[in-house]
A protein has these predicted regions:
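Glycine-rich, basic loop-to-helix element that forms the pyrophosphate-binding segment
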Residues: 69-85, 95
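Catalytic core of nucleotide-sugar-dependent glycosyltransferases
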Residues: 208-215, 221-254, 259, 266-284
Length: 315
């Protein structure tokens, strides 16, 4: 029986893929499958992964599933992997990142003991530019939490939407898909999932189980490519607050701030930014829970834009 499936899209990671695969294989246990998705990579990343497994860990080959697709982005890669995943729970790993010790042991233990819908955990962050490792403290203490309105408010304000910071039951994920051809697909998907699973139990684990590699080649750090701009626009459309989902205003405001920031960085005219903001903020229904940014954006739009301009100037 497969308890956990971990999905790993692969694209142009020759420099990192062996470290990623080694971090998986040196702790792999029964009940786990690893789905490697070749997202049409033009280099030898997938071949390196296959060869490394075959030569050093042939006894684990039957726990790996290999998918080849034309280049369609990691959203489609994850969606295709979800269709064939056999695990009761689904985890994610980026192919330039790597697992920390006891990832599988700790998660399988929680899955067997707690029977929760979602598991959260912490990670380390390695900055390739600065050459240091730091902690990403998503979870403060080991506990079972109930996914209610108060919990979602805290979660939405934290804004830790990386797929690899959580494991989710497959029957929950099957009701959703990652949006294709956009960046920030995780931020577009996971807030919806947490509303859908209202009332479910979430186990929060303080342990650091993944190391995230922060590097210049990452898509979000490479200027403003079209998929990033599309993702921001889609986020603004998807998260207009409603009476059923008032906390969407937090996500909506985050996307709106990103949109205005990109307009400033791309040197669009002050008046185009001003009128865009005025037009959009009418969708925000303020209440005491919403941050000061929303208040500034709705009632002091010029001040809000000036703050963003100053922030970008001093970066």
């Amino acid at each position: 029986m497969i308890i956990l499936s971990v999905i790993v899209p692969i694209y142009k990671v020759e420099e990192y893929i062996v470290e990623c695969i080694e971090s998986i294989c040196n702790q792999l246990i029964s009940g786990v499958e690893i789905i490697l998705v070749n997202d049409g990579t033009p280099d030898t990343s997938m071949a390196l992964a296959r060869n490394y497994i075959a030569q050093k860990y042939p006894h684990f080959e039957n726990q790996f599933v290999f998918i080849d697709q034309k280049n369609q982005g990691q959203s489609v890669a994850r969606n295709n992997a979800l269709k064939i995943a056999k695990g009761e729970y689904i985890g994610f790993l980026d192919s330039d990142d790597y697992l920390l010790p006891n990832y599988f042991y700790e998660l399988i233990k929680v899955i067997n003991e707690k029977k929760v819908e979602i598991i959260h955990f912490n990670a380390k962050q390695y900055d390739t530019d600065q050459g240091y490792i730091d902690s990403m403290c998503f979870v403060k203490e080991n506990k079972v939490s109930i996914n209610n309105e108060l919990y979602r408010e805290k979660l939405f304000l934290q804004a830790y939407w990386y797929p690899w910071l959580r494991v989710i039951r497959k029957d929950v994920l099957n009701k959703f898909q990652f949006d294709a051809n956009v960046y920030m697909e995780d931020k577009l998907l996971f807030p919806k999932i947490y509303y859908f699973t209202d009332g479910c139990e979430i186990f929060e684990m303080k342990k650091e189980l993944v190391c995230y590699r922060h590097r210049d080649g990452s898509s979000i750090r490479s200027g403003y490519p079209e998929p990033l701009l599309k993702g921001i626009d889609l986020g603004i459309k998807k998260f207009i607050p409603t009476s059923e989902a008032p906390l969407y205003s937090i996500i909506y405001n985050q996307f709106l701030a990103q949109k205005i920031s990109t307009m400033i960085d791309r040197e669009q005219s002050f008046f185009s930014i001003y009128f865009f903001a005025l037009n959009e903020v009418g969708n925000i229904k303020l209440n005491y829970k919403i941050s000061y940014k929303v208040f500034l954006l709705k009632y002091c739009t010029l001040i809000y834009i000036a703050i963003l301009k100053l922030r970008n100037f001093f970066r």
